[in-house]
């Protein structure tokens, strides 16, 4: 018994826990600063059905000082941006947690939309990238009713409501409801009948219900999709690259900028 106790009671704390404790102790919510998006957002590699975004360290990584330090910093950032932080930021900014870029990003610099799998309003399972590929799309992303309402304001343009009149929209519209938990996922699916009555039938196969957990915290941050309460609008080109992005409610000039960017990307694609 003495030997057993001796082997299990080392005095040194495992490296990963030391790094984590230090980082968490220094983590404190910082005042959110609204800034304009300038650098392209997205993933470095195109999405595929086999893509999985992993967060955390393997057992071997726990013995690497560099990897444990990086993971500790990630955990500290996630800890500092809790649901309460998201709610406070949303109230302060009215959902405009960042300002959109003044124009669309050039194709050679743009980054990719992530892989997301889910169920559409038709009841079929599928990957979002399969619907996006080959077309210029305007993608609406939200996790709650408030966020959906804000993002929907970008689709009211020139006397039309493109979400109600899908046949007049200048580009393909794709909607993604990111459910925060299995309970919310179940509730959204329970309401699928009501959603089908609100969304034009032609767009049912382009309305996805996806689990938010597919995108770990660090991935959501790199995509600027971190705030749970606001809504997002993205312009995605036929090669699945994010060319423009906005969040929160749209003023008239914001909606005009969105559809101006859509036309610009469409002209660019037609010229290739």
Swiss-Prot record:
Any one Pfam family match given in the protein's UniProt record, by short name: ATP-synt_10
GO biological process: mitochondrial proton-transporting ATP synthase complex assembly
Main location: mitochondrion
Keywords, in A-Z order: Membrane, Mitochondrion, Mitochondrion inner membrane
GO-annotated molecular function: unfolded protein binding
Lineage top rank: taxon: Eukaryota
InterPro entries: ATP10 (IPR007849)
Cell compartments where the protein resides: Mitochondrion inner membrane
Cellular component annotations (GO), alphabetically ordered: mitochondrial inner membrane
PANTHER family per record: MITOCHONDRIAL ATPASE COMPLEX SUBUNIT ATP10
Function: Involved in assembly of the mitochondrial F1-F0 complex.
Similarity remark: Belongs to the ATP10 family.
Record-given protein name: Mitochondrial ATPase complex subunit ATP10
Highest classification ranks of the organism: Eukaryota, Fungi, Dikarya, Ascomycota, Saccharomycotina
Gene transcribed to yield this protein: ATP10
């Amino acid at each position: 018994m003495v030997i057993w106790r001796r082997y299990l009671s080392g005095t040194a704390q495992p490296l990963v826990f030391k790094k984590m404790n230090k980082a968490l102790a220094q983590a404190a919510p910082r005042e959110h600063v609204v800034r304009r998006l300038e650098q392209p957002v997205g993933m470095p590699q195109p999405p595929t059905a086999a893509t999985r975004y992993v967060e955390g360290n393997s057992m071997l990584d726990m013995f690497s000082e560099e990897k444990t330090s990086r993971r500790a910093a990630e955990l500290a950032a996630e800890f500092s941006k809790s649901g309460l932080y998201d709610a406070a930021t949303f109230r302060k900014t009215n959902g405009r947690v960042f300002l959109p870029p003044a124009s669309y990003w050039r194709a050679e610099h743009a980054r990719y939309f992530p892989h997301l799998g889910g169920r559409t309003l038709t009841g079929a399972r599928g990957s979002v990238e399969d619907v996006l590929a080959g077309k210029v799309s305007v993608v609406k992303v939200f996790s709650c009713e408030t966020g959906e309402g804000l993002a929907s304001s970008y689709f009211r343009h020139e006397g039309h409501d493109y979400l109600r009149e899908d046949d007049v929209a200048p580009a393909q519209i794709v909607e993604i409801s990111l459910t925060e938990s299995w309970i919310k996922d179940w509730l959204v699916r329970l309401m699928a009948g009501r959603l089908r009555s609100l969304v034009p039938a032609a767009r049912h196969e382009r309305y996805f219900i996806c689990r938010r957990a597919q995108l770990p915290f660090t991935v959501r941050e790199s995509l600027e999709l971190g705030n749970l309460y606001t809504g997002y609008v993205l312009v995605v080109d036929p090669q699945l690259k994010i060319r423009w992005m906005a969040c929160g409610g749209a003023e008239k000039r914001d909606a005009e900028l969105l559809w101006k960017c859509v036309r610009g990307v469409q002209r660019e694609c037609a010229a290739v």
